[in-house]
Amino acid sequence: MVLETISKIIKTQLPAYLKKFPLPETIGGFARLTVLDWLRLLPLLGILALLGYLTIRPFLPKKKKQKDSLINLKIQKENPKVVNEIDIEDLKSTNVCYCRCWRSKTFPVCDKSHIKHNELTGDNVGPLILKKKIL
């Protein structure tokens, strides 16, 4: 079924399309084409543009990977790592660390991704540590 459809397209529909194809013999002939002729040319021009792009794409410059940017721009820049500890009475577990670098795989819980981030960027961001307040 699929092969019959492809065969019909190649053997009958493609030659019929190419017979009606308004390809002028000279460059100046393109100026005399009607709107209907240009509409008939669009599929071929689209395919040629796609093939041209796919041909030159390997030679185009690759996008440079954007360097990780700083998160902490001005808070406690004199400290090697900014970590805040907060005591909370109603906390169910003893310690909870929350990520502030937005790189954690277990976000919002900190997985120490800030260490690699700090090494790469020179930043000093650290986790937010919530401790259970002992009365």
Swiss-Prot record:
One Pfam family cited in the UniProt record for this chain: MitoNEET_N
Cellular localisation: Endoplasmic reticulum membrane; Mitochondrion outer membrane
UniProt GO MF annotations: 2 iron, 2 sulfur cluster binding; metal ion binding; protein homodimerization activity
Residues bound to [2Fe-2S] cluster: C99, C101, C110, H114
Subunit structure: Homodimer.
Family designation: Belongs to the CISD protein family. CISD2 subfamily.
Name of this protein: CDGSH iron-sulfur domain-containing protein 2B
UniProt organism field: Salmo salar (Atlantic salmon)
